[in-house]
């Protein structure tokens, strides 16, 4: 199984005043690293942490320690990601969302931890739901 990490749970874990903080703490206790993500999620996480008054470097420590790994290379997946952005332009999907959908497509058994309800809409390979851990 490939555990995929979205922005929401990562921010919630590091931000004690986040609505989903307790839920995120419990999930991170249960999940076995590494969690896979992408640089777009890292950028969103750092931005949201800074905006909430937290040190964005806290998120980077997860990468340094190997808790979060970034196996996704946008350059290698650009055509597929562009197609996903176009497909979900009515939602709309962010770059991070499209990258995570693609990451779910390239793994046989993905499980995505997210607080984003849009992932109930998104499909991998056109029709397959993405297995989720949500609050």
Locate the predicted segments by residue.
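Conserved glycosyltransferase catalytic-site signature
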Residues: 94-98
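Metal-dependent nucleic-acid phosphoesterase active-site entry motif
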Residues: 1-18
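Short, ordered loop/turn segments at secondary-structure junctions
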Residues: 117
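Charged, low-complexity surface patches
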Residues: 17, 51, 93
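PIN-domain endoribonuclease scaffold, especially VapC-family toxins
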Residues: 2-3, 22-90, 102, 106-113, ...
